[in-house]
Amino acid sequence: MRVRYENGVENELPIIHLCVAPQGSGKSSIIAPSDVILRDIVCKDNENRSREAAWKAAKRMGEMIDRPQDLAVQILSSDCTAAAFNQKLADASGKYLYMRMDELEGLKKMAGSVDRATEILRLAFDAATYGQERVGADSVTTRCTLRLNLVASTTPVTAQKFFKGSTLDGTLTRIGLSTINNPDNVRWKYGTYDLRYADELAPYVERLKSANGLITCPQAEEHIRALMESAEDRLAVNGQDHLAAYVYRASIIAYREAIILYLATGKWTREIADYMAWSLDYQLWVMDKVFGRQIRLAHEEAQAAERMVPVVQNLLTAMPDEFMADDLKRHFISVGKKVTSVSSYLRQQVHRGNLTRTLHGYSKTERFRQRYEGMV
């Protein structure tokens, strides 16, 4: 299934989530309820694992038989190797794979390096094309959409170390974050996830399984646009500019979660709208709590590097008094800036009083012309 995002692009609903919390804080509490949700997939996987084991045993006995083509195993073990990952991705035939890792180090081992691991995270979030080319006759050559749902956990120190080189490359913005606060060291009370719980959950799971095609929810689309603008304004007022670049994908994560709830319940509710607002704020709060200092330092280093070369003081100075968004996009391209940041830049300039919206585009304000009179 697919949804249409704020930028007009249609894509899928992969979930990449990382819980960052101290040791012994209860990060493993998701295991029991998620096992209930995945129960049907586990049963199918067990059948196919048995068939694969039988094929391997026959090969060891010298039988010349081809590997069965329909051996989809969707739930991968945390010690999965790179070769096994590529094989399972090829076997899945378009179905989503699921991985649950108790520590990020497992992702590094599977990928072969931190750089490769972060690349997988980025591609998985975007449901982008992934693959490898191999020359061996028995090696897997695959190139397909990377459909992967990943849930992992780690400690704050390990997370900061793992993503130290990926602060500004788009990896962090693509990860849904959570944490566990327990300052009073209260002993957790765990739920009971038995057959009764499975029966209560079954209608929601069935609705999700039956969803397909392009999913539309006008209420969610309208709500997320308002939440994005509100978050950007709030960060500007609070002096948290270092988080501004994280608003867009944090809103995508909140939107995906809301759509999943919408599909599971079969209707749009006030509770889902409230959850969407909370999720966006929570993503930014955890990002700042865990990676805030790291992000600030990376931004300062990037700004220091930019000051070493001539820069345009204000991108609007090159534009006519009235222009359209496409005009600014072309200017962004000419000065080497990312076109994807145009919408955010325009919203910021309107918020700062430098631009006003017109019927067909934007117009510079008198305030802007007075402030930058010597540059226009």
Please provide the spans of the model-predicted regions:
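Phosphate-handling catalytic cores of nucleic-acid transaction enzymes
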Residues: 1-376
